[in-house]
C-alpha cells in the first residue's frame, strides 16, 4: 500500500497539509492521446486531509483549468450554510512523489480565506489509513 509520511512544524494550527496534483481522468487522457489533443498541465495545489469532510472538495478553478465539464450537481452542508448546490467533477488526484492516486468525484465549492485549495474527505480515507501523531508533528496517509 503506497504511503506518504510528512512532518510539519505547524501541524496543530495548519493540520495535515500536502501537495497534490490534479489531472484529467485517465480515460479522458487516453481519448486525448488517441485524438492527438494536448493534455492539460497538472494543477498543483495544497490540500488538507479533513476527517470532518464526508467528501472531497476542491476550488472551482481546478476543473476549469483542466477544461472539465461537471458530471452532476450535489448539495452540501457547511458550518455557515445548508443544502448549498455545487457541481461535481470526476478528476484524478496524484501525489507523484509517493505514487498515491485517487480517481473519483470531487465537489467544487468555495474554499476562501484559506491556504489550501482542496479538502481530502472521508470518501478517499475509506480506502486508506491516516495516522496522525500530534506530539511528533507527523502524519502518514496510505491509500489502496
Model-inferred region functions:
Residues 1-144:
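Pepsin/retropepsin-fold aspartyl endopeptidases
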Amino acid at each position: 500500500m503506497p504511503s506518504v509520511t510528512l512532518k510539519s512544524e505547524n501541524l496543530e494550527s495548519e493540520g495535515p497539509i500536502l501537495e497534490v496534483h490534479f489531472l484529467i481522468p485517465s480515460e479522458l487522457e487516453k481519448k486525448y492521446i488517441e485524438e492527438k489533443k494536448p493534455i492539460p498541465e497538472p494543477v498543483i495545489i495544497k490540500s488538507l486531509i479533513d476527517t470532518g469532510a464526508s467528501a472531497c472538495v476542491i476550488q472551482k478553478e481546478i476543473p476549469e483549468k483542466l477544461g472539465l465539464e461537471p458530471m452532476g450537481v450535489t448539495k452540501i452542508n457547511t458550518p455557515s450554510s445548508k443544502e448549498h448546490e455545487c457541481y461535481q467533477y470526476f478528476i484524478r488526484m496524484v501525489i507523484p512523489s509517493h505514487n498515491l492516486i485517487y480517481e473519483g468525484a470531487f465537489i467544487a465549492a468555495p474554499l476562501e480565506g484559506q491556504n489550501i485549495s482542496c479538502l481530502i474527505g472521508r470518501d478517499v480515507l475509506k480506502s486508506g489509513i491516516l495516522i496522525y501523531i500530534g506530539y511528533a508533528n507527523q502524519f502518514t496517509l496510505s491509500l489502496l
